[in-house]
A protein has these predicted regions:
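Charged, terminal alpha-helix-loop-beta segments
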Residues: 1-151
Length: 151
C-alpha cells in the first residue's frame, strides 16, 4: 500500500487519496473500461505493486487485446520499456488477435513523446493521462487522451 507522501507533491491522486490506490484503480477501470477511450473492453488480467498497475483488456467483438501499463506519478523510461516488453510477449502469445499498447500515467512528460512516436512505427501505442477528482465525497477517475500513435 502506498501513502499520499509516496506520490509526490501536486499529484492528483494524492489530493484525492484513496486507501489502496492500485486495487481502486483496477476496480474503476473494470467497472467502466470506456474511460480509457478504447471502447467497451473486458478485463482479462490485472496485477499491481509499487505504484504500477498492469492490465490486459480484450475487445471480443474486434478480436483485439489491449496491454495497459499504468503508473502513478510521471512516466519514466522503465514504464515505456515495460509496456513494450509486455506488448511483445502478449502479441506472440495471442498471435491471432490484434494487440495494442496503452501507456497511462498521471503525467506523460513531453520528452518521451518523440521516443514514443519512434516506437509507434513498430508498436501501436495509445497515450492517456489519468485525472482523479473528488466531488460531494465521491472520487472519480478519467483518462485524458494525450495523443494516439495508433496506426
Amino acid at each position: 500500500m502506498i501513502s499520499p507522501s509516496d506520490l509526490g507533491p501536486g499529484s492528483p491522486v494524492q489530493s484525492c487519496f484513496v486507501e489502496d490506490v492500485e486495487p481502486w484503480l483496477v476496480e474503476r477501470i473494470s467497472e467502466d473500461p470506456t474511460i480509457l477511450g478504447r471502447g467497451d473492453l473486458v478485463l482479462k488480467r490485472a496485477s499491481w505493486r509499487s505504484r504500477r498497475v498492469s492490465l490486459l483488456l480484450e475487445n471480443p467483438a474486434e478480436m483485439a487485446l489491449y496491454v495497459l501499463e499504468l503508473q502513478l506519478g510521471p512516466t519514466d523510461d522503465r514504464h515505456i520499456i515495460r509496456l513494450v516488453e509486455r506488448w511483445d510477449a502478449t502479441r506472440k502469445r495471442h498471435w491471432r488477435k490484434r494487440c495494442f499498447a496503452v501507456l497511462v500515467a498521471e503525467q506523460i512528460a513531453p520528452r518521451y513523446l518523440n521516443i514514443l512516436q519512434l516506437i509507434s512505427r513498430a508498436v501501436p501505442v495509445a497515450l492517456r493521462e489519468i485525472r482523479v477528482s473528488e466531488a460531494a465525497g465521491t472520487v472519480t477517475l478519467a483518462a485524458v487522451r494525450v495523443g494516439s500513435l495508433l496506426r
